[in-house]
Amino acid sequence: MLKPPLPLRSLLFLQLSLLGVGLNSTVPMPNGNEDITPDFFLTATPSETLSVSSLPLPEVQCFVFNVEYMNCTWNSSSEPRPTNLTLHYWYKNSNDDKVQECGHYLFSREVTAGCWLQKEEIHLYETFVVQLRDPREPRRQSTQKLKLQNLVIPWAPENLTLHNLSESQLELSWSNRHLDHCLEHVVQYRSDWDRSWTEQSVDHRNSFSLPSVDGQKFYTFRVRSRYNPLCGSAQRWSEWSHPIHWGSNTSKENPLFASEAVLIPLGSMGLIISLICVYYWLERSIPRIPTLKNLEDLVTEYHGNFSAWSGVSKGLAESLQPDYSEWLCHVSEIPPKGGAPGEGPGGSPCSQHSPYWAPPCYTLKPETGALIP
């Protein structure tokens, strides 16, 4: 059997070796917690086979509460398995730039979910660097840089007080703890006649004046605060203060709303009752139109009584009957040649049809033809 030339044979071995590298690449065994999956196979590898070190760590959120303490928290439930992550922090470009681990962890379901830092550990105007680590995967960590002056949340205003400046003018005042010169405020108020709040911004002051109030209304006021641009660029407002009230609370409801609440049901009931009365009046005053198929009932069942058959009410039928009596009177003429007027069988020229009175009878006078009583 002939053997292929040496150059062609070496070329075939070279192609096979290249294919073997693409299909069966050998990866050295890791010494520590290295990922054993090559980078070009990550997209084709199912998510179940990914190592924990390839998963990102949750984001850390820090808030400074009234520059008294700071909480840095993260979502511990985002981990594939319960993991006690550790938090380390330091301040960039400062004298206190050494890395420190959190000394007071916050827990959620017995797993670390945050860190509490006291006032002495807070440097408000220095860059705060926070690093979250997985103790079981040293290479798995995330670092964030934060400006703490933009993360301050003040306490809600306290000691709200109202003063009467005049008969129709009120002044609202309040106090804050420790941060009066760095706060801006929002005042909301409404009366018991209003459905929504009226909002007014107040800068660098702890008071607000309302120039026109109605003593017959019941007013409610509340205030909240925020770290203003002079000291930071915080976006989070404090909680609302406890409300304070002023005015007459005898009328708890708007009179307009109260009258509507009473008049609308009464008007509806009156309309329904009126419609029922009209319906029964029409039933009694307007007879029903009989149908042709029931004409035989007029003879068989009602014996010719049209009123009963047609549905005319008894009162209406009686109202159509006359309330007087009429008498019939026969008028006769005298014979032309002195004849005696004809008398009836009873000897009277008139037929009396009533036992109470007899109507007058008239005869013709021969000369004039006029009626003579």
UniProtKB/Swiss-Prot annotation:
Localization (cell): Cell membrane; Cell surface
Main localization (coarse): membrane
Signal peptide: 1-22
Record bears the keyword NADP: no
Gene Ontology biological-process entries: CD4-positive, CD25-positive, alpha-beta regulatory T cell differentiation; cellular homeostasis; cytokine-mediated signaling pathway; gene expression; interleukin-15-mediated signaling pathway; interleukin-2-mediated signaling pathway; interleukin-7-mediated signaling pathway; interleukin-9-mediated signaling pathway
GO MF term list: coreceptor activity; cytokine receptor activity; interleukin-15 receptor activity; interleukin-2 binding
Ranges that cross the membrane: 262-283
Clinical note on disease: Defects in IL2RG are the cause of a canine X-linked severe combined immunodeficiency.
Protein name: Cytokine receptor common subunit gamma
